Regions:
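Pre-Walker A (Motif I) flank of P-loop NTPase domains
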Residues: 39-42
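Short catalytic-loop micro-motif centered on adjacent basic/acidic residues
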Residues: 148-152, 261-263
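PAPS-dependent sulfation machinery
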Residues: 72-150, 219-223
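A conserved segment at the C-terminal end of the G1
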Residues: 54-67
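ATP-binding Walker
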Residues: 50-51
Length: 322
């Protein structure tokens, strides 16, 4: 986003900042492209940001079984087929490190989390949203000539019940990491993107337009009720977000038939664990994927009571099997 030209920035503003433009592009796309959806065996990856959702997206996308929104679909993500007729000249297969500075490299063909643009356009409490969401998935599958859709959207942790209701035959993966490593990563990224945004106002606008509020200048807590640690520059705020978010999900979905918790540490340590996930998702082609151990040394003063609760919850999550 920090390498966009003037015209690219203006095009993103035109396509993403206006509710009317987003709705109109979607309506035109539906009028020209088939929305027939013959399959609902889709996969949704949704957890707190920095839980390994992107690397898991990349790992599953490698199977070549799924369609997923990519950087090439920006900024007209609600009209991927129409936009593809105009965007071919913008394609760049050269890999560059993404703005997070975490070693993950991307190109215009890389899958990414742009689905939230749909939910920002169509209220998830609207009765028409279910049909529109199915149509949206069908349009993406149509463009990439696939039958299954792969989504990575951290904001979906707020609406897993809705997605399960709309697509009951799909599977949902909730990645999680060690709470202390995860909290440190969130705080680090929060500070990083706030500093980046001070140097380039477009970053704030871009993150707002794609619904990226997990950290940075547009930060909105996933859970904001009854917080003991409200200072987002304190690591305990992020540990509390980890604990409350995953505790809520654990209580609600522990016995769910289509929602599964996935340990990022186990992905890094066990090839068998990865193979179990492939089997779970009905991916017949077996292949390896390198999940990078992201553990970092750092010092911080954690709330002892909160730290114990988080550790106990992590143990419960780790006891679950795929």
């Amino acid at each position: 986003m920090n390498n966009y030209s003037w015209i690219q920035k203006k095009l993103h503003k035109f396509a993403l900042s206006s509710q009317i433009i987003r709705e109109t592009s979607f309506d035109i796309e539906k009028s020209l492209v088939s929305t027939k959806n013959i399959n609902e065996d889709h996969v949704f990856v949704a957890g707190l940001a920095r839980s390994g959702t992107t690397i898991m997206l990349n790992g599953l996308y490698k199977s070549n079984l799924f369609a997923s929104l990519s950087y090439s679909d920006m900024p007209f993500v609600l009209a991927p087929n129409i936009w593809s007729n105009f965007s071919s000249s913008y394609k760049n297969t050269k890999l560059i490190e993404r703005a997070h500075g975490d070693g993950i490299k991307i190109s215009t063909s890389s899958p990414e989390a742009f689905e939230e643009v749909f939910w920002m356009t169509f209220n998830d409490k609207d009765k028409e949203s279910a049909k529109n969401f199915k149509d949206f998935i069908a349009l993406i599958n149509n463009k990439y000539n696939k039958k299954r859709y792969l989504s990575k959207n951290n904001q979906n942790i707020r609406r897993l019940d809705l997605i399960s209701k709309i697509l009951p035959h799909s599977k949902i993966l909730i990645p999680y990491r060690n709470p202390f490593q995860h909290s440190n990563s969130l705080l680090t990224q929060h500070k990083r993107f706030i500093n980046l945004a001070k140097k380039d106002n477009f970053i704030t606008d871009y993150m707002k337009w794609i619904g990226h509020s997990e950290f940075g200048p547009n930060y909105i807590p996933i859970i904001d009720e009854n917080l003991k640690h409200q200072n987002e520059m304190n690591i305990n705020h992020w540990l509390e977000q980890w604990y409350k978010t995953y505790l809520n999900s654990y209580k609600k979905y522990i016995n769910s038939e289509n929602i599964y918790f996935v340990s990022y540490e186990k992905l890094c340590q066990s090839e068998e664990y990865w193979e179990n996930i492939l089997n779970l998702l009905n991916i017949k082609i077996k292949y390896s994927f390198s999940f990078k151990d992201s553990e970092k040394e750092f010092s911080a003063r954690f709330d002892s009571e909160l730290a114990k609760k988080a550790t106990d919850l992590e143990s419960k999550l780790n006891s679950l099997t795929i």
